Amino acid sequence: MLANLFRSASAILFLSALLTGCGFQLKGSAQGSDPSLIGQSIRLISDEPRNELTAAIGQQLKLAGAILNEPEAATLVLRLGAEQFQQRNLSLTAQARSAEVELTMSTHISLNRADDALIPKSEASVVRQFLNDPQNVVGKTEELRLLREEMYVDLASQIIRRIGHSLNN
């Protein structure tokens, strides 16, 4: 029994060392974040300062090591436009009801350092599809809510990656 425990522990230790050695990192982990954001002083200005996307971006900036400041102290200014959410039917059932829906979440962003536009005004967007089950209204509503939350996080991650890339160039 002790030998089996030792083998199991050795196997787990070997696999974790192998994954670490090959450079594997979880997506979005703090250790895997872009080092160019660490210590950057950023002012976040949003057309919708209290919405979920602004909160998600602020949270991810902090996790990446950025410091959110007032305009006087910030060296970078990140501007977010209004969030736009659209639904589009991809396919219909025989009863002319929506069978598959495409969801698009987007916003306009820009990043400036003094008078230099690091990211000129551009659109960031994420697109998802989901199957619309007309028989399961409660489940569909919950799935849509979870999908929107996931889209907020994905869009915020995309914006953070763009910021990191612009700071490295």
Language model segments and positions:
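A structural "domain/chain start" motif
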Residues: 2-7, 20-58, 64, 167-169
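Short coil/turn motifs at beta-sheet boundaries
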Residues: 35-37, 71-73, 96-102
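C-terminal/domain-edge helix-coil "capping" segments
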Residues: 138-169
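Solvent-exposed, acidic/flexible segments
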Residues: 50, 54, 100-104, 144-156
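Sec-dependent N-terminal signal peptides
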Residues: 7-14
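Sec/Tat-exported extracytoplasmic proteins
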Residues: 61-65, 111-115, 134, 158-167
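Surface-exposed short loop/turn segments
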Residues: 79-123, 129-145
